């Protein structure tokens, strides 16, 4: 694909995303305004929530970059960040595969081999889901399943994470059947997969910290605990992510989050609705602004060719 054609595709994606998100923001802002609540959010806690999300992005970007390097490729962190944020806009196009596909194409254009470009994107997507489940279930098991099940559940999920290097090829074949294309993952050092799992797990915890800062800022008081906040956010995010028909998980994530807020003692009624709607606006803005900024501020550059790392 020529440079001009690729830029056209990118800007077409931007237009679709902005139109979709703008409509959702307008609708949800109206719903927020109609709530029978007086909200005076803490600016410092809101800033802390944004900082925690950006920190989780930094961890995820480093994790993906590390996976690319494990394939014997080279990719600078700045290039990895640009690819990550711009391709993230594809989450707001129905089908979810746009994000993984865009990440692979952009990495290849940055000089990464096609196998490593697509393979690393798929690895991170799969490992991120496994790590998210491994974070959400133990944290929520105490209240959802009973404290006696926390240790067995945590042990089982830990084994699943350790088995990730062997589970990935199976998951890739399943993804291939879903996408109707050959999705084979070449051999990857087990250590690289485990590092990816740890990185994704840390990112989920940072997401939980960010979400807790947000709902404490909105309510003006601390409710629930950090474990419940992390479990509620992670579980609802994964439900939205796995709903292929929902762009950005919008609608599905909110449907899942509401009951979890009440279950973990965070909020109920109008306050739960406030957190659900505000968190969608908060997350949408944080997800799309960096990608748009990278597109607008990107300086023309030549395509580089990767060489195996020493």
Where do the model's predicted regions map?
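Transmembrane alpha-helix interface/packing and boundary motifs in multi-pass membrane proteins
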Residues: 86-93, 234-254
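Hydrophobic alpha-helical segments and helix pairs
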Residues: 114-141, 155
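Mid-bilayer segments of alpha-helical transmembrane spans in multi-pass integral membrane proteins
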Residues: 88-97, 125-133
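Re-entrant/interfacial helical elements at transmembrane boundaries that shape
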Residues: 97-110, 245-263
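Predominantly cytoplasmic-facing regulatory/coupling regions of multi-pass membrane proteins
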Residues: 1-83, 132, 138-242, 263-310
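Juxtamembrane transmembrane-helix termini in multi-pass membrane transport proteins
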Residues: 65-68, 104-105, 118
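Membrane-interface alpha-helices at helix entry/exit sites of multi-pass transporters
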Residues: 77-82, 99-100, 108-125, 267-278
């Amino acid at each position: 694909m020529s440079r001009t054609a690729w830029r056209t595709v990118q800007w077409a994606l931007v237009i679709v995303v902005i139109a979709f998100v703008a409509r959702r923001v307008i609708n949800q802002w109206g719903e927020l305004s109609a709530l029978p609540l007086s909200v005076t959010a803490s600016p410092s806690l809101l800033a802390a929530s944004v900082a925690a999300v950006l920190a989780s992005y930094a961890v995820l970007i480093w994790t993906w970059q590390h996976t690319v390097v494990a394939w014997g490729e080279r990719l600078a962190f700045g290039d990895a960040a640009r690819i990550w944020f711009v391709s993230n806009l594809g989450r707001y196009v129905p089908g979810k595969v746009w994000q993984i596909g865009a990440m692979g194409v952009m990495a290849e254009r940055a000089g990464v081999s096609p196998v490593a470009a697509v393979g690393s994107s798929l690895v991170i997507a799969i490992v991120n889901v496994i790590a998210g489940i491994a974070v959400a279930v133990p944290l929520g098991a105490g209240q959802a399943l009973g404290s006696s099940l926390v240790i067995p559940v945590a042990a089982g999920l830990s084994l699943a994470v350790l088995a990730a290097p062997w589970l990935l090829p199976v998951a890739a074949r399943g993804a291939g059947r879903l996408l109707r294309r050959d999705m084979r993952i070449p051999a990857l050092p087990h250590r690289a997969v485990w590092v990816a799992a740890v990185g994704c797990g840390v990112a989920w915890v940072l997401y939980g910290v960010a979400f807790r800062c947000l709902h404490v800022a909105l309510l003006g008081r601390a409710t629930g605990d950090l474990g419940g906040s992390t479990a509620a956010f992670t579980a609802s995010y994964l439900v939205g992510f796995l709903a292929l028909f929902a762009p950005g998980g919008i609608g599905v994530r909110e449907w899942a989050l509401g009951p979890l807020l009440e279950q973990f003692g965070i909020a109920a009624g109008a306050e739960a609705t406030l957190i659900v709607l505000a968190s969608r606006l908060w997350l949408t803005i944080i997800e799309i602004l960096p990608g748009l900024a990278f597109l607008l501020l990107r300086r023309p550059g030549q395509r580089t060719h990767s060489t195996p790392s020493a």
